[in-house]
């Protein structure tokens, strides 16, 4: 999938797509070749778990929202 953040295009792949439903609180994605894990806190805020690549909090939220819209979470 694609997302544009601050006028830059990114490509990401959802690794656990078949397991996503309305109760999903963790997303595993590959963003430009790097594994990223996002966790949903307080039922609405997506944050990045520790990893080699650090994303801006707003970008992590944008990725989580993008997946949420795609899978109607």
Question: How would you describe each model-predicted region?
Answer:
Residues 1-73:
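Cysteine-centric segments in proteins
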């Amino acid at each position: 999938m694609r997302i544009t953040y601050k006028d830059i295009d990114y490509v990401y792949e959802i690794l656990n797509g078949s397991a996503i439903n309305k109760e999903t609180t963790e997303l595993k994605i590959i963003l430009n070749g790097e594994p990223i894990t996002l966790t949903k806190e307080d039922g609405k805020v997506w944050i990045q778990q520790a990893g080699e690549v650090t994303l801006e909090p707003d970008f992590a939220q944008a990725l989580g929202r993008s997946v949420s819209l795609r899978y109607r979470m």
